[in-house]
C-alpha cells in the first residue's frame, strides 16, 4: 500500500467547516462595509460563477461601478486567502498528528534513515548529504508583509479551533478574536504603495528565519542525528540542511544590488542569528538555577562563572546562571563587533539581572567578543560536560541542545549568500581592465581560444592585479570591484561560509568563467592554488544546455581549475535554469534537455575525477520547474545527486512552505528524504528500456520544440497577443519586487524576464509555459505507429521522470480555464492578434486528451484528489476575479480609470495569484 502524501490538505470536512465559518465572518464584515443592497451583487456573481454561467457573469461585472469594484475585488481576493490559511492549518495539524502517533507517511525521515542504516555506505551518506534551499526575492510574492502578519495571526487562531469546539478554551472568545483579525485583514491595504527596495526584501525574508526556519532546521538536524544513533550510527556533525540566500547578492538585472546591499544582507543575517543565540542564553539563564551546594560544577564552568559581571549575592551559589550570563555578554560584544548593532531586543524583561553592579574583579576582566563560533561552542560544550559529569544529562536536552546544534549549522552568518551577475557585465569589466593595463586593447573582439589564453596567463601571474588607482574606471567597473571587495571583507569577518558561490548568468563559454576568476583575483579571492569563492556557471537556454558538456569538459581540463576544485573537496557546482530554457523551447524541451544535461555533466565530472553537484533554479510554477518537491527530486536522473543538492525557493513559495515551523519542518524533511532516496535507490527502470525511452523522448521533444517556437517566435502576431491579451503591462507596474521586469527595454519575447512571463500566463489562466507543444508532439508520435500509445503508457507507469513530467502537465491544465482565456483574448486590438487564441485553444484541447490517454484516466487530477477538491472549492471565487480584472483592464486601457483606480487591477492580480498558490 503506498504511503500517505501530506503535501496538500486531507481533512476536507474540517476544512469545509472552517471555511464556512470564515466566509460567514467575511460576509458580515463586507455587508457592514457596503450595505445589504450592494452585497446582493456579490451574491449574484458568486452564483453565476458556481453555475459557470460566464456570459451572464460578464454582463453583471460590466455594470459594476469603479467604486463598487474596490470592495467586491477585495472580497474575492481575501476569500481564497482565508481558504489557503485553513488548508495550511490542516496540513500543520496533520503533520503533528502523524508524527505524534508515529504514523508513516511518504518522505518520513525515520523511514528513510531506517532503510539506509542497513546499507554498507549508510553512515557515509548520512554524514555527507547536504540539501540547501536558497531563498530568493524573485518578485512573485504579491502579499504585503502586513497581510502576511495578519495571516499568521489567523493561522494561529485556527490551530485552536478544535480546542475551542471541545470547550478547552472559550468558543465565544475564540470566535470574537478570529472575527477581529478577519475584519482587520479585510480592511487593510492589500497592495504596496511603493516598490520594494532590496533592504525591504532582506528584512521580509528574515521573518521566516525568526518565525520558523531556525527552529525547524535545528530540530530536524537533531532528529536526524538521533534517528541515526537509534540504528547504531554515530554521526560527526552532519549538516543535512543548510540555508542559502540570494537577496543582497543577486545583481543580475537588478541595478539596486550593490556592495552596500551585500554588506547589509550579511550584517542583518548575522544580527538575526546572534539575537537568536542571545535569546536562548537568556532562557537558559532563567531556568538553570542549579546550586553549587547541591551540584558541584567542573572547573571550566567555575571559570566562566567567575568572569561574569553578574556578581549579585543572589547568584553566589548559582554558577551555571553566571556562566550563561558571561557567555551571553560575550555574544553581545560579538554582535557589536560583527554588526555594529547592540543586542537591542535584550532587556531585564527576559530574565537577566541587568541591574546588578559589576564587582571590581569583573571590571578587571572585560567582556571580550568571540573570535569565532568555535569558541562560543567550546563554552557551551564545557557546560554540557559539567552536566554529564554530574549525571544531569536530561538537562542538556531542550534549549542547550538546540543552541549547540544551531551554532554548528548557522555559525555567526546564518545563511550563505550567493553572488550572481550576467556574463556580459563581467566581460565588459574584464575588457576594461585589460585595456587599462595595456594588455589587450579590444578583448571582446578576440576568439574564444585567444580569450582563454589571455585570461589564464593573467591568472597565473601572481600577485599582479590589473586595476590601478592611476587609471580611471567606469562606474560599472567601480561598482563590481566594490562588491567583490565587500565579499572578501565579509568572508574575513564572518567566516568562509558567508559567501561561497558566485553564479554566472548566461554562461556560454569557458572564458565567461575565467572572466569571473579575473574579477575575483583583483580583490584577493582567487589565486593559483585556491578560489575562496566557487565559480558556478548557470546554463539557461536550450542551446546553452546543449553546449554545457563541451564547456565544462574544457574548463575542468585546466590545471588551475583542478587546483581550485581540489581545495573545495573536489566539488564543482553547476546551476541549471528552468525558467529561461522553458521560455526558449517550451515545457517538454526544457524538461528533457535539463534531464539529459544532468546525465552528461555527471559523466563529464566522473571522467575528470570531479563531483558535479547541481543547483536547480526552480520557480513555483511548472513553467519554471515547480511542482511537488519530493517528486521533483526523486525523478532526477539516476546518479545525478551525489550528496549535495541546492534549489531556489522564491516568492509565494517561501510563505507556503516556511510560513510556520511545523510545515517548514515537513518540507525540509521531504527535501532530505527525497535526496537520500534518489541517491541510494537503484535504477527502477530496466537500463535497456531507458535507452529506448530516451530515443522516444528525443523524437517527441524535437517536435515539441519546433511546435512551440513556431508559435512563440515565428508567428508575427504572438508578441502582440501576449502583451495585449494578458495583464503583463499591469503586472510590470505592480510593486512586488526590487528588480525590473526586464533586463532592458522589451521589444521581443527574449528580452522579457521569465518571471513576469510566467506570472502573466497564470493571470490570464492559459498557463501556457506549462503545457504548450506537449499535445501535438505526443499525438505525432502516437500516430506514427501502432502500439506507440501503449509504449507511452508503459513509460508513464515505469519511469519516474516521465511520470513526474506528465503529472505536472495534468496539474497545470487543471488550473487553466479556456473560457476565461477567451475573454482575455478579446482585449487584443486586431482580429489577427485575437486569432492566436484559437491556436492555443486547439493545442490545449489536444494536450488534455493526450495526457489523459497516456495516464489512462477519465479526468484531470485523478491521482491527486485533495488538490482536485481544493481547486473545486476555490475556483469559483477567483474565477470571478478574472472577469473583474478583464473589465478593469478594459476600462484602464480606454482611460476610464484614473491612476488611483489602477490599484484595483493590482488587487485582482493579488487575488488570482493567491488562489492559484503558485504564480511565478
Swiss-Prot record:
Q: What does this protein do?
A: Forms oxaloacetate, a four-carbon dicarboxylic acid source for the tricarboxylic acid cycle.
The keyword Magnesium is annotated on this UniProt entry: yes
Pfam families in the record: PEPcase
The family this protein is said to belong to? Belongs to the PEPCase type 1 family.
Kindly give the NCBIfam families that the UniProt entry links to this protein.
PRK00009.1
What is this enzyme's catalytic activity, as reactions? Answer: oxaloacetate + phosphate = phosphoenolpyruvate + hydrogencarbonate
Where do the catalytic residues lie?
138, 583
Q: Which domain of life is it from?
A: Bacteria
Please give the HAMAP family that the UniProt record associates with this protein. PEPcase_type1
Q: Does the keyword Protein biosynthesis apply?
A: no
One GO molecular function term of this record is: magnesium ion binding
What is the protein's given name?
Answer: Phosphoenolpyruvate carboxylase
Q: What is its EC number?
A: 4.1.1.31
Q: Which GO terms describe its biological process?
A: carbon fixation; oxaloacetate metabolic process; tricarboxylic acid cycle
Q: Which GO terms describe its cellular component?
A: cytosol
Task: Give the matching SUPFAM superfamilies.
Answer: Phosphoenolpyruvate/pyruvate domain (SSF51621)
Q: Which UniProt keywords apply?
A: Carbon dioxide fixation, Lyase, Magnesium
EC top class, in one word? lyase
